[in-house]
Every structure is written in C-alpha cells, then in structure tokens.
UniProtKB/Swiss-Prot annotation:
Entry-linked SUPFAM superfamilies: Metallo-dependent phosphatases, Nucleic acid-binding proteins
Family according to the record: Belongs to the DNA polymerase delta/II small subunit family.
Gene Ontology MF, one: DNA binding
Gene Ontology terms: biological process: DNA catabolic process; DNA strand elongation involved in DNA replication
GO cellular component: DNA polymerase complex
Keywords per UniProt: DNA replication, DNA-binding, DNA-directed DNA polymerase, Exonuclease, Hydrolase, Multifunctional enzyme, Nuclease, Nucleotidyltransferase, Transferase
Protein name in UniProt: DNA polymerase II small subunit
Subunit structure: Heterodimer of a large subunit and a small subunit.
Underlying gene: polB
EC numbers, comma separated: 2.7.7.7, 3.1.11.1
Function: Possesses two activities: a DNA synthesis (polymerase) and an exonucleolytic activity that degrades single-stranded DNA in the 3' to 5' direction. Has a template-primer preference which is characteristic of a replicative DNA polymerase.
Species annotation: Pyrococcus furiosus (strain ATCC 43587 / DSM 3638 / JCM 8422 / Vc1)
Gene3D superfamilies cross-referenced by the UniProt entry: 3.60.21.50, D-family DNA polymerase, DP1 subunit N-terminal domain, Nucleic acid-binding proteins
Catalytic activity reported: DNA(n) + a 2'-deoxyribonucleoside 5'-triphosphate = DNA(n+1) + diphosphate; Exonucleolytic cleavage in the 3'- to 5'-direction to yield nucleoside 5'-phosphates
C-alpha cells in the first residue's frame, strides 16, 4: 500500500482516488505533511479527503492542483452502463407519449426483465422537465456526513479555532430549594424501556477479502437495511383487510388480463405529470411503473409520500408493463384500536427537548424557573395538583449545544467546551426532584454519532449525566412504556425531509409533518436527504407498533396534534433565536412545557416560561 494512503489510514482518515492523484506528488515532494492535511480536514468537519477538500487545501498552501490523466472510465468500475429504455403508457385513451426512463441499480431486487414495449400515450407532460438537476451533496444545503475509519457515519469533528478563553458558569453553585410546604403524591414507579437501539443485536456484513470494490461493505449494509424495511412494513400493510390478492412484482406478468391485483414495495421514484403521478415501485423480485390518475381519491395522499417509503397500490396490470392503480395505501395507523384500561390514579409526564446548554441563547432563567416549578414553587391550585403528580420527565435530544456543529458556532457559545457543557447540564438536572425519573435521548447537537439511529451519548463526553441517579439514558429513537402507555421518543430530524419534500408543510407547524411520518410508520424514511442514516443491517427506524404518544423536538417550535387517537407532540426548545436561525428563518417558541396525562395519553396543559427567556 502507498505510504501516503497508509499514513492517512493510521490517522483514521480516508481519501478518494481523485484526491489521491491531486495530492500525492506534492506530498512526495515534502510540500505538506500528513498532520497538516489531517488538521485541515478536521477543521472542515470531514474524515474523508475528497477532491474538493484536496483542491481547497492546495489553494491554502499556495499550490496548483495537479490533475490526473483523463481516462474513459471512472476510478471504480460499475460494469457496463445501462441503456435507456422507452415506454408507452395507455389509460383509457389513445393519445401518445414517449418518456425516457433510466433504470438505476437496485438495492433490494434480484432484477426483472426490462420492458421492451413502448407505452401508449396519455398526453402526459412532465412538470419541471426543463429544470436543471441539482446535486444531493453539500451544495444544496444538506449537512456533510462525517465517517469513521470503517466508513460508518458518525458525529463530530470539532472546529479547531484558536481564541481567547471564555469565562462561564457550570451551575456548580446553583441552589433550588424544594418548597417545604409542598406535598408530593406517592406514586409507584411503573416504566419499561420497550425498545432501545443498544438492545438490538446486529451482525454487520464483513468484507470477504481485501480485493473487493470500494465501498462494497457499505452497499451491502444498506441493501440489508432496505430489505429489512420492506419486510417489516410489508407485514404491517398485509394487516389491512382491504389489501387482497397481493402479488410479487416479478410475478405480475403471469396475472390475468383485467385482474385486479395489489403490489407492495419501496418507492424508488415519484414524478408528477399532467394526468397524475408515475411511481417506480420495487420489491425483492423486481420493479414496475405505477400510474395513479389525478381523479383518484388517494391522489393527495400519494402526492405527499417520500422516496424510499413502503406503500401499496391496487389496480390492473397491463402487459405493456404498467400497473394502472385506482387505490393507494400507506402502512398508517389503524382506524380502530383496542382501548387500554384506565389507571387507578392520575400521573403526569413532562415532555421537553432541545435544551442547548452552552449556547448564549440558552434560556437559563426560564429553565431555572421550570426547575423551581418542579420543586413545588407553583402559583395556582391547578399547577399544584399537576406538579404533585409529575412522575416522569422525557427529554428528546439536543440537551447541549455541542461544539463544531455548524460554521461559526463558537461565537454563539457561552460554554465552548463540550465536557463542561455536559457537566453544566448535569448540575442543572440534579435539581430535578429525585422521585421524578428522567429519560434522556441524544440529538444531532449532542456528542453522539451523527447518523441515526443514535445508540446513546459518547460516555467520555457525557459522563456527568450518566451519573445522575434518577436518569435513564435512551437511544434515538426509543420506546418507553409508562403505566401501560407507549411513548415513542425521537429527536425529529425526519421532519426536515418531509418539510423539504411536501409543499405546504413547514417547520412552523411541525405536528403535520410528524403525522406524515406516522402514516409512513417510519422516523426518517428518505435516504440521501438531509438526515444521515447509518448503514445498519436492520432498519431500526420503522415504527413497528403504534404508540400512544409520539414525542419529537429538533425544529424548536411547539405543536401538538392528535391523529387517529395518537398524541403527537413537538416540545419546542429552551433556546431563543440564534443568528444562524435568523438566516434560515427559524422562529422558535422557547420555554413551552407540555404536560401529558398518562391515563389518557393526551396533553392536558402547556406551561409557559417564555416570560423569563
């Protein structure tokens, strides 16, 4: 192995072939050292030396990039390029169209015979056909994915900025006395962590030899993940009594003409045309084009579905290779569910998220007022009744502001040290009364791997919160059962992909995109969007059982909606608007605290501490 590459691997850094050719000659001439290159890459929050990063590094060093000799092929062969195939479609008319369809390599199917026939026209003109495609990298506002030495996405390459030290408090001297005249109701603890990522035994694929294609192990892991997703969600869809005569896509060519069939598969692509929507759907046996007309009663629901979601269509298969659908189905929540027996006494859970300790916009005074409230310093009889029966506090991620999460973050921090941020958080949470059990999950600002699911915090950074005796650390996502009611806890990054893909949905009303995620029964279904997904061999983001409460955060805006009996809550934040949020038009609603009656699994009150924010 080349000494240059070997040195980078020892430092846990990867390099792309194009970047290697740009840098190798200058490295051999002694123009820069491995240490300089690694420091530069780390400052750019990347563990992979790409050609763009290499070019930028050379410019900083005052060196001209040396371009590699052009070749006809790529650096890594993917085999022969696939030919474009032409299709014709018909749907009750004789109007003609022709559309070019590029077939991509399948993650999950074993392949199906390419369709040779051209489809009859339905007078369809693609919307946005003349628009230029935009790459799905960092250019379009997505977050850079950072990888560890095995190629797995992980969290955090902190910014290395030499600045003057800041003086700050870690709340060591904070005292919040419990109201001596306040009496708490003794309620027996009854909780169980039903699902936690750490409790799932995964067997990642192994490289058989060192001569495999670049990234082969990652591709196989993602293929396994999508097969797992399809299997889990197919099982949920099959529970719908309306789905009869389900046929594998690879067997569609054997169905009788005009026979109504149902298919279940992953959404590879979705396109809007003049007369409806065209999907490419894939299962383990093959792929098929599906046309859903605009006059279908399910058109609006189908329009909102994300790529990589698992759906079902019912319709008639044409021998020309198209399924003409008249019904569309999501895994969704059943219309009727068995009611759970009532509890013998009232007990409440508090939902919060996005505390962002360490940020200069952290609403310190408001959070201290909240802690005082938990300690019995209340103003009304109603609040006294509620706080006396609060038994659980659930925190859905971003408990600290982190370090190096976004460019220029250092200027927004009062506590610039990640260790001290967690110590400050632990000092604050130590004032939560000991009879209240806290559940704490990580988010994208926390010291945890960036890709979801996030198993837990990195203990070397977050050790202080692990020492809290009344704290239970959970994964993102996780399911906890409180007195027989299931709470799905997820930080909520999947909301970003829904808002970015479905017109009319915004961050300002996060309850609606949360409903869409629940309908798809997945925390973050879209692959390659704004949310990095870890290449686990099993999809742990599927919502396999319908919860009673879905609790998310991330978008810093409070909202609560009920969908088919399920209470969905976004618990906002404890951070006022930052300069970065102003630039991206995020208007937070800080210091809102929803209180959930565990018996009914519904929000019964929203406390407002924003007056101290």
């Amino acid at each position: 192995m080349d000494e240059f590459v070997k040195s980078l691997l020892k430092a846990n850094y990867l390099i792309t072939p194009s970047a290697y050719y740009l840098l190798r000659e200058y490295y051999e001439k002694g123009e820069f050292s491995i240490v300089e290159l690694v420091k530069f890459a780390r400052s750019r929050e990347s563990y992979i030396i790409t050609d763009a990063l290499a070019t930028e590094f050379l410019k900083v060093k005052g060196l001209e990039p040396i371009l590699p000799v052009e070749t006809k092929g790529g650096f890594v062969s993917t085999g022969e390029s696939q030919k474009e195939q032409s299709y014709e479609e018909s749907f009750g008319t004789k109007e003609e169209i022709s559309q070019e369809i590029k077939e991509g390599e399948s993650f999950i199917s074993t392949g199906s015979e390419p369709l040779e026939e051209e489809l009859n026209s339905i007078g369809i003109e693609e919307i946005g056909a003349n628009e230029e495609l935009v790459s799905n990298g960092n250019d379009n506002g997505g977050e850079a994915i950072v990888f560890d030495k095995y190629g797995y996405p992980m969290v955090y390459a902190p910014e290395e900025i030499e600045v003057e030290e800041k003086e700050y408090s870690k709340y060591e001297d904070l005292t919040i006395p419990m109201n001596p005249d306040f009496n708490y109701v003794e309620i027996k603890e009854d909780y169980d962590v039903v699902f936690d990522v750490r409790n799932v035994k995964l067997k990642p694929p192994k490289v058989k030899n060192g001569n495999g294609k670049e990234g082969e192990i990652i591709v196989e892991a993602y293929a396994s993940l999508f097969r797992s997703r399809l299997k889990k969600l197919r099982k949920i869809l099959r529970e719908n009594p309306e789905l009869d005569n389900v046929v594998d896509i690879g067997k569609l060519k054997y169905v009788k003409e005009d026979e109504t069939v149902t298919i279940i598969g992953l959404v590879n692509s979705k396109r809007e045309v003049n007369k409806g929507l065209i999907f490419e759907i894939e299962d383990l046996t093959g792929k098929v084009k599906v046309f859903l007309p605009k006059d279908s009663e399910d058109y609006r629901e189908a329009f909102k579905v994300l790529p990589d979601a698992v759906v079902a269509f019912k319709g008639v298969y044409s021998k020309r290779g198209i399924l003409y659908a008249n019904k569309f189905y999501l895994p969704d929540v059943p219309l009727y569910r068995r009611q759970k027996p009532p509890l013998e006494e009232k007990v409440y859970a508090i939902l919060i998220s996005d505390i962002h300790v360490g940020s200069k916009e952290f609403c310190e005074n408001a959070f201290i007022k909240f802690l005082e409230w938990l300690n019995g310093n209340v103003e009304t009889k109603e609040e006294e009744e509620i706080v006396s029966r609060v038994k659980y506090l659930i925190i859905a991620g971003d408990v600290v502001d982190g370090v190096g999460v976004y460019p220029g973050q250092y200027a927004d921090l009062t506590i610039p040290d990640i260790f001290d941020q967690y110590e400050a958080l632990a000092n604050l949470l130590s004032h939560v009364p000991k009879h209240i059990t806290m559940f704490i999950a990580p988010g994208n600002h926390d010291a945890a791997r960036q890709a979801i699911p996030q198993p837990e915090f990195y203990k070397e950074y977050a050790k202080p919160i692990y020492k809290l005796k009344n704290a239970v650390i959970i994964s993102n996502p996780a399911v906890i059962r409180l007195h027989g009611r299931d709470f799905l806890i997820a930080h909520g990054r999947g909301i970003e992909d829904v808002v970015g893909s479905v017109p009319g949905l915004t961050h300002h009303k996060p309850g609606l995109p949360m409903v869409e995620l629940l309908k798809m029964r997945h925390v973050a279904p879209m692959f390659g969007g704004k949310v990095p997904i870890a290449p686990d061999p099993e999809d742990l983001l599927v919502i396999e059982e319908v919860p009673d409460v879905v609790h998310m955060g991330h978008v810093h805006v409070y909202d609560a909606v009920v969908y088919r009996g399920v209470q969905l809550v976004n618990s906002a934040t404890w951070q006022a608007q930052t300069e970065f949020q102003k630039m991206v038009n995020i208007v937070p609603t800080p210091a809102k605290v929803p209180v959930v009656d565990i018996d009914t699994a519904k929000v019964v009150k929203v406390l407002d501490f924003s007056g101290w924010c």
